Amino acid sequence: MAYRKLGRDSAHRKAMLREMTTQLIMNERIVTTETRAKEVRKTAEKMITLGKRGNLASRRKAAAFVRNEVADVHEEKDAVVVKSALQKLFSDVAPRYKDRNGGYTRILKLAVPRKGDAAPMVILELV
């Protein structure tokens, strides 16, 4: 499988992709460079596909990749409900795409490049 190295060693690249995928699931949009967005798109689409399957093996594969971070905290009937990124993936994000076969993300190019190095910036969001 072909992939971009992104100027990092394999452990750093994998950690960065895991973190950015988790942030995309939690916030449903991130601002990043174009090349990073194209790589994160691949992993995010795979995680959403696992979420659509919803079986135990899919949950375990997704749990091995998505970081265990708090995605949402709210109150329901005198109890505080804390939802992790993995729970949000399986209960909120994946059911939204049950009738869609792939293409869960969208890349929108920003008009202004990054200030320091003029890297092309994009918004990666869930459709």
Swiss-Prot record:
One of its GO terms (cellular component) is cytosolic large ribosomal subunit. One of its GO terms (biological process) is translation. The gene is rplQ. SUPFAM superfamilies: Prokaryotic ribosomal protein L17. Belongs to the bacterial ribosomal protein bL17 family. It comes from Lactobacillus helveticus (strain DPC 4571). Gene3D superfamilies: Ribosomal protein L17. Part of the 50S ribosomal subunit. Contacts protein L32. Pfam families: Ribosomal_L17. Keywords: Ribonucleoprotein, Ribosomal protein. InterPro entries: Ribosomal_bL17, Ribosomal_bL17_CS, Ribosomal_bL17_sf. This is Large ribosomal subunit protein bL17. It comes from the Bacteria. GO terms for molecular function: structural constituent of ribosome.
